[in-house]
Amino acid sequence: MPRSKNAVASRARKKRILNKAKGYWGSRGTILTVAKHAVDKAEQYAYRDRRVKKRTFRALWIMRINAAARLNGTSYSRLMEAMHKKNIDINRKALAEIAVKDPSAFSQIVKTAMD
């Protein structure tokens, strides 16, 4: 009985890794073993950074809200406390967008919350 080498599956596996490594510098994009390590590491970074992205954007929204709140004579923490007490439910993403795109509307929100 002839030896079975499973060439189709192994070639597909190698091709999948090298396609993911396309565009990598030097041997990282051409040599299978090096490319495999590079792709594995890239996928680890991608997995981690999909989670870090959420934290980063929340921090950015808070910075923008704080800057706009200080232009209106209050701080981020005092503004959020006042909004919670008045049951003004606007999430940070939307509030940051309003602060950047429509400062007069943001001023009205601050005035409503602080009164």
Curated annotation (Swiss-Prot):
It comes from Prosthecochloris aestuarii (strain DSM 271 / SK 413). Transmembrane segments: none annotated. Belongs to the bacterial ribosomal protein bL20 family. NCBIfam families: rplT_bact. The gene is rplT. One of its GO terms (cellular component) is ribosome. One of its GO terms (biological process) is translation. The lineage of its organism: Bacteria, Pseudomonadati, Chlorobiota, Chlorobiia, Chlorobiales. GO terms for molecular function: rRNA binding; structural constituent of ribosome. CDD domains: Ribosomal_L20. This is Large ribosomal subunit protein bL20. InterPro entries: Ribosomal_bL20, RIBOSOMAL_L20_CS, Ribosomal_protein_bL20_C. Gene3D superfamilies: 6.10.160.10, Ribosomal protein L20. The keyword Ribosomal protein applies. Binds directly to 23S ribosomal RNA and is necessary for the in vitro assembly process of the 50S ribosomal subunit. It is not involved in the protein synthesizing functions of that subunit. It comes from the Bacteria.
